[in-house]
A protein has these predicted regions:
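Secreted/periplasmic proteins
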Residues: 23-171
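Sec-dependent bacterial lipoprotein signal peptides
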Residues: 1-22
Length: 171
């Protein structure tokens, strides 16, 4: 047994340095959640960063609010964050978490950047769930559903971004 507190501290720090790097970057990407999961007997595998950066999808979008009156009994997202209905966030079944997507309401042309931090929707025929605030900004909160197009802008901590196409930097 080591009696010197400085040596004990050095051993603990050394063990932490050896242990934590192995779990800090799943899949080799900072800030990227790639765990598979199951809901109602259906298994889902999140796509790779490379797949996500090329991902675009058109489908039916809905909005959800898992918080209750004044935020009491508010749930957590798949990333462990509190559900915040006033934030511009959303849920997708297989995109990496977190990631930022550009959502376009094809019914009125409104566009919004949304951070995905949750899984869902788990209702057939829907490709994206948004918070009430995001749905309001896109103009479909009253209707409940809208046809939208999503395009991934960045994945994880923001280091992995869609490459711009075009010969000028602003195109």
């Amino acid at each position: 047994m080591v009696k010197n507190p400085l040596i004990r501290l050095a051993l603990v720090c050394g063990a932490a340095v050896l242990f934590f790097p192995s779990c800090a970057r799943p899949g080799g990407y900072d800030g990227y959640m790639m765990r598979s999961y199951s809901v109602r007997g259906q298994s889902y595998q999140p796509m790779s960063v490379e797949q996500a950066l090329k991902f675009e999808e058109t489908g039916v979008c809905s909005w959800y609010n898992e918080s209750s009156f004044l935020g009491i009994k508010r749930g957590n997202t798949s990333l462990g964050e509190k559900v915040m209905p006033w934030h511009l966030t959303g849920a997708h079944k297989t995109l990496p978490l977190p990631c930022v997507v550009k959502v376009t309401n094809l019914e009125n042309g409104k566009t919004l950047k949304v951070r995905l931090n949750d899984r869902g929707p788990f209702i057939a025929g829907r490709h994206l769930d948004l918070t009430p605030r995001a749905a309001k900004k896109l103009g479909f909160r009253e209707n409940g559903l809208a046809t939208t197009h999503i395009k991934v802008l960045s994945v994880g901590d923001g280091s992995y971004k869609r490459k711009r196409r075009g010969w000028l930097f602003f195109f």
